[in-house]
Amino acid sequence: MPKEEVEVLIEGGKADPGPPLGPALGPLGVNIQEVVEEINRKTKDFKGMEVPVKIIVDTETREFEVKVGSPPTSAIIKSELGIDKGAHEPRHETVGDLSMEQVIKIAKMKFDDLLSYDLKTAAKEILGTCGSMGVTVEGKDPKEVQKEIDEGKWDDLFEKYEEEEE
């Protein structure tokens, strides 16, 4: 049974039969409206964020499977801050400030997609993205907050979030 894969970037909860979906799925003979409804159902929690979606179609039976990826870290940060864009010159411009709790929340959302082995290193990866976007954390440069994590300043907060997991 031959399978075809279609990968697209869709705004959460706002897929429609037009491009890029319609033209990509049309030749595969699948019911495009059913695919759109399934994508919107699975991405509704990511409203306002671009989400990678993979549609796997069995070209014989016309059955399909929708797999939703995690939005890019930058999209989650922008959503948390309620902004449209990062800074044009991140070293000289600040577009927003996240709390350490928000950084940890994002790290938990992205954990499976990151190379990190624990929540602290995941948070440091998120801080790296903040730095490249012109986003401060707790009013400080994200590099400074990364050093504070290494020094143990945020250990109590990390322990609180790690206990919630158990």
Swiss-Prot record:
BP-aspect Gene Ontology terms: translation
CDD domains: Ribosomal_L11
Taxonomy, superkingdom: Archaea
GO MF term list: large ribosomal subunit rRNA binding; structural constituent of ribosome
Keywords, comma-separated and alphabetical: Ribonucleoprotein, Ribosomal protein, RNA-binding, rRNA-binding
PROSITE patterns: RIBOSOMAL_L11
Gene Ontology cellular component terms for the protein in this record: large ribosomal subunit
InterPro entries assigned: Ribosomal_uL11, Ribosomal_uL11_C, Ribosomal_uL11_C_sf, Ribosomal_uL11_CS, Ribosomal_uL11_N, Ribosomal_uL11_N_sf
Keyword DNA repair found: no
Function: Forms part of the ribosomal stalk which helps the ribosome interact with GTP-bound translation factors.
Subunit structure: Part of the ribosomal stalk of the 50S ribosomal subunit. Interacts with L10 and the large rRNA to form the base of the stalk. L10 forms an elongated spine to which L12 dimers bind in a sequential fashion forming a multimeric L10(L12)X complex.
PANTHER family to which the protein is assigned, alphabetical: 60S RIBOSOMAL PROTEIN L12, LARGE RIBOSOMAL SUBUNIT PROTEIN UL11M
HAMAP family the record matches: Ribosomal_uL11
Family statement: Belongs to the universal ribosomal protein uL11 family.
The protein, known as: Large ribosomal subunit protein uL11
Gene field: rpl11
